UniProtKB/Swiss-Prot annotation:
Residues spanning the membrane: 43-63, 68-88, 96-116, 150-170
Comp. bias regions, Low complexity: 224-237
Record's bilayer topology term: Multi-pass membrane protein
Keyword Transmembrane: yes
One Gene Ontology cellular component: membrane
Alphabetical keyword list: Membrane, Transmembrane, Transmembrane helix
The name this protein goes by in its record: Uncharacterized protein F59B10.4
Subcellular location: Membrane
Region (Disordered): 216-247
Keyword Protein biosynthesis: no
Source superkingdom: Eukaryota
């Protein structure tokens, strides 16, 4: 009568194999960061960035304290943000686009303000005063000198401009993702553009693998990637359960630290 042996994988070896509950199936896509973003979170995030959006109005108020231009621009900014939030809730992409363009304009303004602030730090105050005296009638340089004087008067202006630029960039990214999700849902939900999880251990290990020494998950994944891909019409490769029973007739088992041999 033939002798049969039951080979059970070692628990220490089997602990390296991720379970099916912990690892997604092959081909399952991971949702993007902004695909599952709740509309309420977008509303709260955009509302919290209103102070950063209003920095340009504060700068204009410091330069022109008696003008109605800062107040008008603040109202316009608030209206566009509110319109974008209503568009996100009602899923109307045309209501988000004006706010997105407005954010890009504000980003350019803050970058311009940051460059002037850095230039003002490099020029001493005496040089600025001499420039005012030597060029009193040149109108093209007047606005530039006003911004430089403002940057020299408020030393924290460059740091505030950098912080508000980062906030505006994040807000513009959120608005663009919301607009893209509403306007082009097929592009956002395209599985080819999403990251896919690696295949499970069972899909990598072939049925003809050596029963004496099961490979690790990294080795099985490497061997599976080196195999030629099958055609789309062909069925998926047969998978083997994590705890398979193998029968080897009339074979004496070799000593192995990876396997536990039970004689029947």
């Amino acid at each position: 009568m033939a002798n049969y042996h039951l080979m059970v994988p070692n628990p220490s070896r089997n602990a390296q194999i991720p379970s099916e509950a912990q690892r997604p199936m092959y081909g399952e896509s991971h949702p993007s960061l902004f695909a599952n973003m709740n509309n309420k979170k977008v509303v709260v995030a955009a509302a919290c960035t209103l102070p950063a959006d209003s920095l340009f109005a504060v700068m204009l108020y410091l330069i022109y304290p008696d003008s109605f231009l800062p107040s008008t621009l603040f109202i316009v900014n608030f209206s566009l943000v509110l319109l974008a939030l209503l568009g996100i809730n009602s899923k109307v992409s045309s209501m988000i686009l004006p706010a997105l363009v407005w954010k890009c304009v504000l980003l350019l303004f803050l970058l311009f303000l940051g460059c002037i602030s850095v230039d003002a730090y490099q020029v001493p105050a005496t040089d600025l005063e001499e420039a005012h005296v030597s060029q009193p009638q040149e109108q093209p340089h007047r606005s530039m000198m006003v911004w430089k004087d403002l940057a020299a008067k408020y030393p924290m202006l460059p740091f505030i401009a950098v912080a508000c630029t980062i906030v505006l960039a994040v807000e513009a990214r959120v608005f663009f993702s919301a607009w893209q999700k509403i306007c082009c849902p097929a592009v956002v939900n395209d599985e080819s553009n999403l990251e896919k999880s690696p295949p499970s251990y069972n899909a990598c290990v072939r049925a003809t693998a050596s029963e004496k020494d099961l490979p690790s998950y990294e080795d099985a994944l490497k061997n599976s990637s080196q195999q030629p891909s099958t055609s789309s019409s062909s069925s998926s490769p047969p998978s083997r359960p994590p705890h398979s029973v193998y029968t080897i007739p009339d074979v004496k088992m070799h000593k192995s630290s990876m396997m536990t041999v039970i004689s029947l």
